[in-house]
Regions:
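Conserved PLP-enzyme active-site core in the AAT-like
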Residues: 1-100, 109, 113-117, 206-228
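Conserved C-terminal alpha-helix-loop-beta "cap" of PLP-dependent enzymes
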Residues: 111-121, 125-227
Length: 228
């Protein structure tokens, strides 16, 4: 792209991708990258916020647009500064734990006869794990198992609902400490064929393993998985 026009500004949304690989997009020539602090780089500690990183020109332009020309990064909310720095410090370890959980989930469901993407031994670009089910009820019970194995609101039963912006009903499981924190263990899916669960996050490998095994237990008891 730069060979076509060196003045083109290349921007990437790196949500779910931070610390998954050894290098980040700006090390590969991207002018600017952005992401959410309630995802990977917040380490599960940040309650809100986002970040941008890149060339000085891009950051100055973005800061001027967000606040005011001349003020740039000298203003803005700093209420979570301690959590931001502590979360960033913990983020590589937390991302590693969620990746271990994703690999465990992929291998487990492959052995149970389901398809997963990425497969357990494939290179990963982010923390999202897909599991493909044969029926909508299997998908629903998996998400309910994820919720049941969560540290918050484990008593809640996720139900499909007509979420704005979607053509089909959507089920969401997220027993998280911070609402919407995708670095925490969660799963969601549109209730349509193909029946794909999008699972992501996990503050610890143990948390993911517990939630996934809880989901399997529910599916086994309902006759959706045969382990004989």
């Amino acid at each position: 792209v730069k060979g076509y026009n060196k003045n083109i500004i290349m921007f990437v949304d790196n949500c779910y991708g931070e610390f998954v690989k050894e290098q980040e997009p700006t090390q590969w020539g991207m002018d600017m990258a952005a992401g959410s602090l309630i995802k990977n780089p917040g380490g599960g500690l940040c309650k809100s916020g986002g970040y941008i990183v890149g060339t000085k020109e891009c950051i100055d332009n973005a800061s001027a647009r967000l606040y005011a020309p001349g003020l740039l990064k000298e203003v803005g909310a700093t209420s979570n500064k301690r959590l931001m720095f502590q979360g960033l410090y913990m983020a590589p370890y937390t991302v590693k734990e969620s990746l271990k959980g994703a690999v465990f989930t992929a291998l487990l469901f492959e052995k149970l006869g389901f398809k997963s993407y990425p497969k357990y031994d494939e290179l990963r670009e982010d923390i999202i794990q897909l599991v493909l089910f044969d029926k909508s009820e299997q998908l629903l019970q998996f998400c309910r198992g994820v919720q049941a194995g969560s540290p918050i609101d484990s008593h809640v039963t996720p139900c499909p609902w007509e979420m704005p912006g979607y053509d089909d009903k959507v089920v969401m499981a997220a027993g998280t400490f911070v609402q919407g924190a995708s670095i925490e263990f969660s799963a969601d899916a549109p209730m349509r064929d193909p029946y794909v669960a999008y699972m992501q996050g996990g503050l610890t490998y143990t948390q993911v393993k517990l939630g996934v095994l809880k989901a399997c237990d529910i599916m086994i008891k309902k006759g959706m998985i045969d382990i004989r």
